[in-house]
Amino acid sequence: VKDMVKQSGLPIEIVEGTKERHDAFKSGDVAIAASGTVALELAIVDVPHIIAYKVPKLTEWLARHFIHIQFVNLSNILLGKEVVPELLQQDCTVEKIMYYVEQFMKHKPVYNQQMDGFEKVRKLLGMGQQTPSDNAAEAIIKAIKNYRK
């Protein structure tokens, strides 16, 4: 990746390490993420974000038939409700992405609601106790078990 960036001649800075990555996250107003651990990191450092993701049709079909969870975003799974908008498959459009970006940038209550959710996520993960990945794994397993009841 470093060679490709260097060859491009573009003013791109590659950051390494957790602190540099989190500082880079916090330098923006809103993030668009593809879910996974990066979205959980964004929540931990209070960066408003949305999830935008498309998968191949076969993957979508398999997921719908074999994986029964209400949300894909880790913060949403942990909280049992949507605090991070999930724009998946046909909902992943430029118009919908821009709508949510504008909501976070122009409407303080929308922004505050997500920040409140992130505070709850950090508490659920027991930040400062076990490692965040261990806490996340335990909380997600618990959330999935509760959802299936």
Model-derived features: where do they sit?
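Nucleotide-activated sugar donor-binding and catalytic core shared by glycosyltransferases
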Residues: V1-K149
